[in-house]
Design a protein with these regions (language model features):
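Conserved nucleotide-sensing/catalytic segment adjacent to the nucleotide-binding pocket
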Residues: 104-122
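Short hydrophobic/aromatic beta-strand immediately N-terminal to the Walker A/P-loop
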Residues: 52-53
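Hydrophobic positions on the alpha1 helix immediately C-terminal to the Walker A/P-loop
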Residues: 65, 69
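P-loop NTPase motor-domain active sites and their immediate coupling elements
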Residues: 1-30, 35-37, 41-43, 48-49, ...
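Conserved lysine of the Walker
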Residues: 62
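Active-site catalytic microenvironments for nucleophilic, acid-base chemistry
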Residues: 72-76, 344
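The conserved Walker
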Residues: 57-59, 196
């Protein structure tokens, strides 16, 4: 049984970052979180999480915790070592970090632009994977050890302060990008910190939750909300103002009193950092938002096309959906294959939406 103190101590952020455990942390992505019920400083390594989901009701301490994490990164890493993409649809919490040199883009407040930025991050992840493959490196650390300083890749931390606003604006697109990043971006050095005050299943979907084994819950309204975040109840009984339950991969749920960082401290740190240099947004602006166009001369009639032709020939009819199901490919690819079959005179005229088209036998 845990009985709260009548007079609660405020855990200062300064105290946590001054502790031996934080100062000795080797990772550039070390996060200062707070203290446990025994009074010990608690830190976490984002590279091992490798992504973090934070939830809690209004006033429970969620946004203060996000600020503590951002400040931890600013204390630990230079702009050459860690970059950040900040998405803040609420327009309130992350605006204080505008123009710091760690940013790859101005703080994004428009949900549509946020969806586009997440799509850019997916393309950047894929680019990094190609670079790693060329060097035979398994992850970003191995890569950076084997290339000159000017070719080294920084970590990128994507921070979203209110997921619900993005999900309501363009849920499918946002969910797809977040899922791809959560599944694959760790080796490429891209990590996500996502916060929401609406821990409902339409915001924290099953797919998103499955890819975020590290989760923090502040006080929530109900047992259902607690189970949505932590897969167990308990968060509804927290005291608010930084009281949280932390679930990390391979560990039991731990109760932590979150570190409190003041606005004055944030302004002092960001003012100092801005004086060291200005942000460079040119790299992020050049990342495409659409996949590169296919070289039609060389790529059109590939193995997949000829397999689809054989499938249509054996079935006697073919549709875009049947090609999708048979070969487990997306709609756009299947539609392109159907267009090529039509160009080659292999399919009859359309019979209506969703209906298969007759396959015309090939002449030998």
């Amino acid at each position: 049984i845990e009985v709260p103190n009548k007079l609660r101590e405020i855990v200062s952020f300064k105290e946590i970052i001054s502790s031996d455990i934080f100062r000795k942390g080797q990772s550039k992505l070390t996060l200062a979180l707070g203290k446990n019920i025994g009074g010990e400083s608690i830190i976490a390594d984002l590279t091992k999480m490798p992504h973090l989901l934070v939830a809690g009701s209004t006033g429970a301490g969620k946004s203060v915790s996000i600020n503590s994490m951002v400040m931890s990164l600013l204390y630990k890493a230079s702009p050459k070592e860690v970059k950040m993409l900040m998405i803040d649809p609420k327009l309130l919490e992350l605006s204080m970090y505008e123009d710091i040199p760690h940013l790859v883009s101005p703080v994004i407040t428009n949900p549509k632009l946020a969806a586009e930025a997440l799509r850019k991050m997916v393309f950047e992840m894929e680019r990094r994977y190609r670079l790693l493959a060329e060097k035979g490196a398994r992850n970003i650390d191995n890569f950076n050890r084997n290339v000159p300083d000017e070719e080294q890749l920084p970590y990128i931390v994507v921070i979203i302060d209110e997921l619900a606003d993005l999900m309501f604006a363009s849920s499918r697109e946002v969910e797809d990008s977040i899922t791809r990043l959560a599944q694959m971006a760790r080796a490429a050095g891209i990590h996500l910190i996502i916060a929401t005050q609406r821990p409902s299943v339409d915001v924290i979907t099953g797919i998103i939750k499955a890819n975020f084994p590290a989760r923090i819950s502040f006080q929530v309204f109900s047992k259902i909300d607690s189970r949505t975040i932590l897969d167990s109840q308990g968060a509804e009984q927290l005291l608010g103002k930084g009281d949280m339950l932390m679930m990390l991969p391979g560990s039991k749920i731990t109760r932590v009193h979150g570190a409190f960082v003041t606005e004055d401290e944030i302004h002092a740190v960001t003012k100092f950092i801005k004086a060291q240099g200005s942000p460079d947004y040119s790299f992020f602006e050049t990342i495409p938002t659409e996949p590169p166009p296919v070289d039609e001369e060389n790529e059109d009639r590939d193995d997949m096309y000829y397999k689809a032709v054989e499938f249509g020939e054996s079935a006697g009819e073919v549709s875009i959906s049947s090609i999708q199901r048979r070969f487990k490919i997306g709609y756009n690819r299947a539609a392109r294959i159907m267009e090529m079959m039509e160009d080659d005179g292999l399919v009859g005229p359309p019979k209506g939406a969703g209906k298969p088209r007759d396959f015309m036998r090939r002449s030998n």
